[in-house]
Each structure stands twice: as structure tokens, then as C-alpha cells.
Amino acid sequence: MIILTGNQKGGAGKSTLTLLLANYLVQEKGLDVTVVDMDYQQSVAQKFERAKLLENAEPYQVVAASLESFPDIRHMLCNHKEQIVLIDLPGKLDDDGLIAVFESADLVICPFSYDEFSFESTILFSVVLRKINAQVPLVYVPNRVKANVRYETKVEVDEQLALLGLVTPALPDRVDFQRVSTFQTPLAIYPVAVNAFESFYEKHFNL
């Protein structure tokens, strides 16, 4: 099963969400997970290498790769039915290397925030994705939501995105998210992360 984490807008929280989901699938569900870091900043791969210096056996592997390399490495990543491959995509849409990745996706998770630019980028990402892979399920994760801010567009945004896919419970804006690693999710944010992921696990993970 190939799961993409993506949005056209950089800084949407793709890499952190990828780590949160990987930790959830391994620690909560006991699944076999491999993370492929295709983001240009390679922040997930860098965290993985740093954590290996401090911890013992890693709970899952992280592989740094480019979009162009995907057709060559796909068969090695998905070597058995129960294998979960999480791909952290670059924050862009103008690369033909995305086509093969989009075509292979079984599920796409899209973090977004409640501002106009993020919403427009999220819609554009979704439209392009669906032109390439019309049947792939989409899951939208409201990210970095501030508790003391009234988002006037929230209801409208949720309604529009719900026409395209599932909108999960929101992830709050907390400093603890900066401490997520390839080995653990901080306890302070673990419940909210689990709540978001449980909202779509049963429907989309037919393992």
C-alpha cells in the first residue's frame, strides 16, 4: 500500500504529518512501514539519521529518494502485500516525476491550514492528483489550528473539501509537534494525532 503525504503549498506540515502517521501505524497498529522522503529538504531523512545516533533499533526505515527514481525503486519498496510505504512529497506540482507517484497511490493525505492561500493550493493539488489518479481516496488534515483564533472560513472550507474526500479532526498548533521524531511522538500530542488517524484507518487500511 502506497500512501502519499502532499500539498502544493510548502510549509503545510507534510513531513511532520508523515512522521506522525508512521509512528501511529507502527506503534498503534504494529504494521510494517517504510518512509520514502522525496521532499527537497529531506527533513525526514535527516531526522532519521540523527535519531539513529542516539537510539537503538529503529522502528521503521527511512529512505531518501528523488521523484525520478520512483519507477526504479517501487518494486523494492512494495515487496509484500502488508507493506506500508509512506511517501513525503515535495511541495510542488510542476515536475513530471510526480505522474508515476500519483498513479501508484492507494491513499493521499493532504495537510492544510484555514487560510485562503492554503485552501487554494489544496484544491489545485487535489484537482491535479485526480486528473492522474481519479479513484484515489483523499484525506484532508487541518493542521496547526490555533485554539484562540476564530477561522471565519472553516465551515466553508470543510464543506468544500468534504466533496473531494474526508476531513479529519484538526491537529492543534503546539510546539510539541516540532519534537516529533522517527522514534517517538511526544505524549502531549499523541492523543490528538491518534484521534485524527483513527478517523480514517478502518475505512482505508484493508490489510
Enumerate the predicted regions with their spans.
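Walker A/P-loop phosphate-binding motif and the immediately C-terminal alpha-helix
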Residues: 2-37
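Structural beta-sheet core signal
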Residues: 34-35, 87, 110, 140-142
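Nucleotide-state-sensitive switch-loop elements of NTP-binding domains
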Residues: 39-83
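Switch II (G3) loop of P-loop NTPases
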Residues: 78-98
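Inter-motif core of Ras-like GTPase G domains
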Residues: 96-116
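Conserved C-terminal guanine-recognition region of P-loop GTPase G domains, centered on the G4
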Residues: 120-138
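Beta-strand-loop-alpha "switch" segments that mediate conformational coupling across diverse proteins
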Residues: 144-149, 155-187
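NTP-binding/hydrolysis catalytic cores, primarily Walker-type P-loop NTPases
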Residues: 185-207
